């Protein structure tokens, strides 16, 4: 039975996260994993090369050693295990899942805020604090987007939730109310 990528990412990230918690190394693991993820994102063919038969095993091992040269023993062993089990193509997904577990454990929420004009840092911070309070998060990491079509106000999207405080929505609701009455 073949496992899907989400299941693989979930299982491996869970095991690694549990180890990180046990060793009190969650932040360090995450930092190392993010660096490795970036290498694989920047070089999408790397996982295929490490998984395929184009390179001899000794060259693959040399490449793995180079990749993990500055990594902790735990991360080196983890990457070696992924290689041994033919899971190098799952590395990015595993790191994404690990980061999601980290964020969940720290009550960190990622959200996108859309505004009609570019927000100042102070405005973005105020929105992040208000949103954190609303969703019970310790921290909100905002990405910003400008869309003049919303006219004014903001729309905040996070985890399949949308909080729409845009003028465009208010006008639409007003229009509906006037038409229905």
UniProtKB/Swiss-Prot annotation:
Belongs to the ATPase delta chain family. This is ATP synthase subunit delta. GO terms for cellular component: plasma membrane; proton-transporting ATP synthase complex. It is found in: Cell membrane. The lineage of its organism: Bacteria, Bacillati, Bacillota, Bacilli, Lactobacillales. The keyword Nucleotide-binding does not apply. InterPro entries: ATP_synth_OSCP/delta_N_sf, ATPase_OSCP/d_CS, ATPase_OSCP/dsu. It is a peripheral membrane protein. It comes from Lactiplantibacillus plantarum (strain ATCC BAA-793 / NCIMB 8826 / WCFS1).
